[in-house]
Amino acid sequence: MEKKNAWEKYPEGTKRQDVFTFAEEYRKFISSCKTERECAAEFYRQAKEAGFADLSEKIAQNAKLKAGDRIVANNMGKGLALFVIGEKDIEEGMNILGAHIDSPRMDLKQVPLYEDTEMALLDTHYYGGVKKYQWVTLPLALHGVICKKDGTTVTVNIGEKPEDPVFGVSDLLIHLAGEQMEKKASKVIEGENLDLLVGSIPAASDDEKEKKEMKDRVKANILNILSKEYGVDEEDFLSAEIEVVPAGAARDYGFDRSMIMGYGHDDRVCAYPSFAAMLEIEKPQHTSVCLLVDKEEIGSVGASGMQSHFFEDSVAEIINLLGEYSELKVRRALHNSRVLSSDVSAAFDPNYPSVMEKRNCAYFGKGLVLNKYTGARGKSGSNDANAEYIAKLRRIFDDHDVSFQTSELGKVDQGGGGTIAYILANYGMNVIDSGVAVLNMHAPWEIISKVDLYEALHGYVAFLKEA
C-alpha cells in the first residue's frame, strides 16, 4: 500500500505556511524546555492562560463541575493531567492523549564536584537508553533546581544564552586511541567516565603558606563562584536535580527547512501537539484528557511516572466534583476510555536500511504513525491494540483527511522498545501507540519532519472530537 507524501496536501502558499508556523512554535518550545520540569511549567502556564483551573483549587472550593469546564492537575511540577469535561457521562469513558515529557540525558550525582590534576569536574549518571559515545565533545548545558534547607529553590539554567559558558565531556585524541578503537561501541565510553569539565583556575590567595596548604584549589574556586552567583554551597547538591542536556536551540534542518533538529523530540514532538490539540477542545461529547508524564525513559516508575496513581486519583477527584463519585464509576470511566499513547516511532533511515522491514516501518512525510504493538522478541512486553479500535481510528483519520501510516519498531528480532501504552491498557482501555517518526532517536540531537508534526496535531484533534 503506497502512502501519499503529506507535503503534497500543502502546496506553496497559505496551507504550507500553516505547517511551518506550527513547526516554528514547536521549535521555540523545545529550544527552551529541555527538562520535564520546564515542560510541565510551560504547559501549566499556557493552560492557565487558556482558562484551565487548577484541580487542587477546585477541590478546596468543593466546586461543581459541568460540561465544558477545563481542569489541570499538577503532579509535583513534573507532569500534568488536563481535562475538558464532556457532555456525556464520564462513565462512558474519556478520550485520552498520553505522552511523556522526560528525555534521555545525564544527571548530576548528589556529590558531583571533584578535582583531579587541577581540573574541576562534575560526576554524572546517565538517564535512559543512550549511546554513551554520542555525549562526548558536545557543548552541554545545566538545567534544573537546587533546593536549599531554608526552603528556597534556586533555578539553574546555564549554557543556553550566547554569553553563558558551556560544559562538556572530553574524549581521547585519535592519536592515542588505538586500544579504545578496538572496544565494542557500548564500552568505548564508560558510564563512569561521563564527567563534565567545569573549571581550571585555582582559588586565589595572597598567603603563600595558605596556597600550599589549601587542597583542591580549583574545586574551591568553583564553589566560590557557585556561592557568589547562586548562593549555594557544596552540600546543597545533595538536594538538587540538575540535568545535563545539549546546549543550544533547535534548528531548521535541510535546504528546504522541512525538518527540525533538536534535543528531546522523544517525546516532546508528541507532547506538544497533544497539548495544542487540547487547547482546541471546548465542549466535547466525551471528556477529553491530555496526560503528560515523567520517567517513561526509565520504566515509568516513581511518583511522577505513569505507574503511579496520579492519573487514577485525578479522575476520581474529577468524578467527585461532578457530584457522582463511587469507586465503581471511577473503574468504569477508566475501563471505557480510548487512548492514543502519543509516543514517537523510529523513522526509516536510508543510511541504515537493514534494521527495518520496508513495508512495515515509518517514513518521513507520511504523517502520523500508528504502532499496533511494540515490544521485543515475539512482541514481549507490548500492548497489542485491538483490530476493532484501529478500524475506528482509520475512519476518523480518513474522515478528517489526516495522513497516517502504520509501523513496527524494526524487523522481527532486531530489537524493540516500549511506551506507557501497556500501563493504561491495564485498566481495560483501548490503547494504541500513535506519534511522530524520529531519526537519531535517543541521540543528543534528533530529527523530525515538520509535516508529520502537523499531521499529529490534526490527528489528535480529530481523535479528541470523534473517538
Predicted regions: what is each one?
Residues M1-A467:
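N-terminal hydrophobic/helix-forming segments and targeting peptides
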